[in-house]
Design a protein with these regions (language model features):
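DPxDG-like acidic metal-binding loop motif
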Residues: 67-123
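Buried hydrophobic positions in well-ordered alpha/beta secondary-structure cores of metabolic enzymes
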Residues: 31, 78-79, 182, 208
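Surface-exposed beta-loop interaction hotspot
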Residues: 29, 130-138
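An extended, acidic
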Residues: 5, 46, 121, 136-256
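N-terminal subdomain of lithium-sensitive/metallo-dependent phosphomonoesterases centered on the IMPase/IPPase/PAP
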Residues: 1-76, 249
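Short helix-loop capping/hinge motifs at secondary-structure junctions, enriched
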Residues: 100, 125-128, 243-247
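Solvent-exposed alpha-helices and their adjacent loops that cap or buttress functional pockets
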Residues: 61-65, 83-85, 99-102, 110-111, ...
């Protein structure tokens, strides 16, 4: 995947527009190449007798003999970064045994620039480059030192109560990588205050849960019952610990 995608990042060839993908975003050549790599691997599984379906941000839903398990594919999460040559984008894969976010039983987030790999299997913990991990320990457990936000400019205004109390602010432009880093304690809180696709969260929210973190919408409601498709959207507030999540809710004025 990295050999196919990285040479196209920040190039005219990689930015070449193709069509509008199933998720509603403009597909570029870099997206197509990345998706082709993933689908080639999945087609090999199907040829060996595995039965499943695939839901891709670019190609939509395809059946390979069974409705479930369902493989979610975002071949380039952070595609605007990739298009512009900004080295912060990744591959997101999730496997579900049902229609909702709570049905996610395996997840992969791959940083396509560094090769760092984050994986999780439901009830078997989260791993970074093959090693089990939990969030970094901090002495000031309830203070938001490093806040990460979803990348639209309006997010800063909507999340102003968090921004004002955070020590520093980061905006990466990749949902999957932002949540993965939060799961390990790299960010104290990640907030998407405007509705985003639940599809984009699936793999990294499993990482977060398996590492002991907490995720809700901005009202403090659980995300598990939400359908995992290309249409369903939700706000997101997540943190590596319950204390940090509770502090973020408090700053947003959400009673618990």
């Amino acid at each position: 995947m990295r050999r196919a995608v990285l040479p196209l990042s920040g190039t005219e060839a990689g930015r070449a527009p193709l069509s509008v993908g199933a998720g509603g975003d403009r597909t570029i050549e870099l997206d197509r190449v990345a998706e082709d790599v993933v689908f080639a691997e999945l087609a090999e599984l199907a040829e060996r007798g595995e039965k499943f379906s695939v839901l891709s941000e670019e190609a939509g839903r395809r059946a390979f003999g069974a409705e479930y398990p369902l493989v979610l594919v975002d071949p380039v999460d952070g595609s605007l970064n990739a298009k512009q040559g900004v080295p912060l984008f990744g591959l997101m894969l999730a496997v579900l045994d049902g229609p909702t976010l709570a049905d996610t039983f395996a997840g992969l987030v791959l940083n396509l620039n560094t090769g760092q790999e984050w994986t999780a299997i439901r009830r078997h913990g989260a791993r970074r480059d093959g090693k089990r991990y939990t969030p970094m320990q901090r002495s000031d457990r309830g203070s938001i030192e490093l806040l990460a936000l979803e990348s639209t400019p309006r997010s800063i205004k909507v999340a102003q109560p968090l921004v004002e109390r955070a020590g520093k602010l980061r905006i990466l432009g990749s949902i999957a990588l932002s949540i993965a880093l939060t799961s390990a304690g790299g960010f104290d809180v990640f907030c998407a205050p405007l509705p985003m696709r639940v599809f984009d969260m699936a793999a990294s929210l499993l990482l977060l849960a398996e590492a002991g973190g907490v995720a809700t919408n901005l009202k403090g409601d659980p995300l598990g019952p939400m359908r995992c498709d290309l249409e369903t959207r939700s706000t997101l507030l997540c943190a590596p610990t319950r204390e940090l999540h509770a502090e973020a809710l408090r700053l947003l004025g959400i009673p618990r």
